[in-house]
């Protein structure tokens, strides 16, 4: 029965007034990858660190050769490290993971700078190894990938009317069913954006119900609290500088209307038309900072409590993962009903990688 057939409308729904949810539009059109199960997994590997700090209240004198540090895993035997404050360079002889210490016996002041006393919290930076001629292979540094997961969530938006509504000639050129199809498509997409931003992960085994985790819950490292007024210098220093430390140099700023107003008050030369957004049918601007570009995607979801919140998302590390992409299901009412009942149905989850490359900005009030 063609009237009861489910229609694949994933591309159509992304075109209904695209400026309502620009970030979701970009996700649906460019970052989509289907999943085969309601629970899906991915692996990610963090970059190996190369900074640590001295962790000893009294510090160390210029002859000590074993140091307790915050993170000894940045070193292996044979590595060279530097104390930036003093300029001293040392060579690692051994690493004790149980004691969180490194030993440099015989290799204090190994470069051009003499050994100097170390202070608690002095920074140490690993410069890599310096191997002798005909040396054996150095000890490997291995980082085990982390297994992450999320669930797909079923979302349904229904709409209907009586047989009389179907039969009546409308005063407007658009028939009631067509109007509802369009307006409820927008509602469905707005709800999708809220879930992808604010959702929390849950599998209710008793009721066979799942929820997908959203952006807000994934971001844990870069959370900047503006605490009120945010200047252009503060935005560049405390937002752009850390968020562009990892990942790509062009990211999407899912912005509240208030943050859009704040950015509009900054230097006009920093706001440019985003030509990359044109291919999605979007008319967006970019904020050009010394550290990277932010494509500004205003979001209607960021209102009320979230009116002063915004999210910076590195699009290369997120994916829209549908198990069942958006379909328009016509005539799902019982056969004896004098009328129609249609619905949009989507079952989708969010894949979110390298959370250090994203950021939450909150409490930016002016």
Where are these regions (language model features)?
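Flexible, glycine/threonine- and acidic-rich loop/arm segments that mediate assembly and lattice contacts
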Residues: 1-288, 293, 298-366
């Amino acid at each position: 029965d063609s009237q009861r057939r489910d229609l694949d409308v994933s591309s159509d729904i992304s075109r209904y007034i695209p400026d309502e949810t620009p970030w979701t539009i970009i996700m649906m059109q460019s970052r989509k990858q289907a999943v085969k199960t309601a629970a899906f997994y991915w692996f990610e590997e963090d970059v190996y660190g190369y900074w640590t700090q001295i962790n000893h209240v009294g510090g160390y004198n210029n002859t000590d050769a074993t140091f307790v540090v915050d993170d000894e895993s940045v070193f292996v035997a044979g590595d060279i490290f530097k104390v930036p404050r003093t300029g001293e360079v040392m060579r690692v002889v051994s690493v004790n993971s149980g004691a969180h210490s490194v030993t440099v016996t015989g290799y204090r002041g190994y470069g051009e700078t003499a050994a100097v006393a170390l202070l608690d919290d002095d920074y140490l930076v690993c410069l890599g190894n310096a191997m002798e001629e005909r040396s054996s292979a150095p000890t490997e540094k291995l980082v085990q990938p982390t297994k992450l997961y999320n669930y797909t969530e079923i979302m349904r938006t229904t709409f209907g009317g009586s047989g009389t509504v179907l039969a009546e000639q409308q005063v407007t050129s658009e028939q009631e069913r067509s109007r509802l199809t369009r307006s409820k498509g927008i509602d469905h997409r707005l709800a999708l954006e809220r879930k992808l931003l604010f959702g929390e992960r849950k599998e209710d085994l008793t009721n066979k119900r799942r929820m997908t985790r959203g952006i807000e819950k994934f971001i844990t490292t870069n959370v900047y609290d503006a605490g009120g007024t945010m200047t252009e210098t503060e935005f560049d220093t405390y937002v752009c500088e850390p968020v562009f430390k990892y990942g790509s140099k062009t990211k999407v700023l899912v912005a509240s209307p208030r943050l859009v107003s704040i950015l509009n008050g900054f230097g006009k030369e920093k706001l440019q038309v985003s030509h990359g957004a044109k291919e999605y049918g979007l008319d967006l601007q970019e904020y050009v900072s010394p550290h990277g570009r932010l494509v500004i995607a205003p979001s209607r979801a960021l209102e009320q409590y979230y009116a002063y919140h915004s999210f910076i998302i590195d699009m290369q590390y997120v994916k829209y993962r549908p198990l069942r992409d958006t379909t328009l299901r016509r005539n799902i009412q019982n056969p004896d009903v004098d009328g129609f009942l249609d619905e949009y149905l989507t079952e989708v989850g969010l894949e979110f990688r390298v959370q250090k490359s994203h950021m939450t900005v909150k409490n930016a009030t002016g």
